[in-house]
């Protein structure tokens, strides 16, 4: 008999997990559909995106080991998730370990960008990363991202006002077109060159 997979769904904007020591009802999840954003938020309300979890990825693994969680997990789009069992089988643990390794490599890349790249370069890298997620779709042959300036600020470790200036600069230079709650990528090649450029400082 085929075992029915347990799933749960959340709407875009829903908070799935909160910081703190996992409670008895907390679970680890695998993303089946949609995109989950993991963010740390300081006392002033400034957010920093730690990781984007795409379909096939995992989050909330602290619940399996009783470790404290330092982030919020928010549904960036409508999502469908599979809660993991409290005692995963070896194959699932192997998948989880591989995902954690990839997530650690991604975290290293984010730290490197924060330390070595100017904000404009980090923004180009963030836009390209978002273009490969469920937040992206195609209009008239161009990639369009559904993203607010607050979300972009969290993605690059900055604040909304500064990000708005950088978005305006990228638009004037022809890399993107900015609209209400969305960004159209006009020059992917140019954005890739920016993203690969180191720059200095912030």
From Swiss-Prot:
PROSITE patterns (UniProt xref): CNMP_BINDING_3, HTH_CRP_2
GO biological process: positive regulation of DNA-templated transcription; response to oxidative stress
UniProt keyword list: DNA-binding, Transcription, Transcription regulation
Record note on quaternary structure: Homodimer.
Organism per entry: Thermus thermophilus (strain ATCC 27634 / DSM 579 / HB8)
Gene Ontology molecular-function annotations: DNA binding; DNA-binding transcription activator activity; protein homodimerization activity
Induction: Increased expression during the stationary phase when grown at 70 degrees Celsius. Increased expression during the logarithmic growth phase in oxidative stress and upon treatment with diamide. Increased expression by heavy metal ion, antibiotic, high salt and organic solvent stresses.
Domain HTH crp-type: from-to ranges: 117-189
NCBIfam families: PRK13918.1 (NF010499)
Gene3D superfamilies given in the database record: Jelly Rolls, Winged helix-like DNA-binding domain superfamily/Winged helix DNA-binding domain
DNA-binding region range list: 149-168
Name of the protein in question: Transcriptional regulator SdrP
Phenotype of the disrupted gene, per the record: Viable, but has growth defects, particularly when grown in a synthetic medium. Increased sensitivity to disulfide stress. Decreased expression of TTHA0986, TTHA0770, TTHA0337, TTHA1028, TTHA0654, TTHA0655, TTHA0769, TTHA0425, TTHA0634, TTHA0635, TTHA0636, TTHA0637, TTHA0638, TTHA0570, TTHA0030, TTHA0460, TTHB243, TTHA1128, TTHA0035, TTHA0520 and TTHA1803 genes.
PANTHER family given in the database record: CRP FAMILY TRANSCRIPTIONAL REGULATORY PROTEIN, HTH-TYPE TRANSCRIPTIONAL REGULATOR ARCR
Task of the protein: Activates transcription. The consensus DNA-binding site of this transcriptional regulator is 5'-WWGTGAN(5-7)ACACWW-3' in which W is A or T and N is G, A, T or C. Regulated genes include those encoding proteins involved in nutrient and energy supply, redox control and polyadenylation of mRNA.
Superkingdom, natural source: Bacteria
GO cellular component term, pick one: cytosol
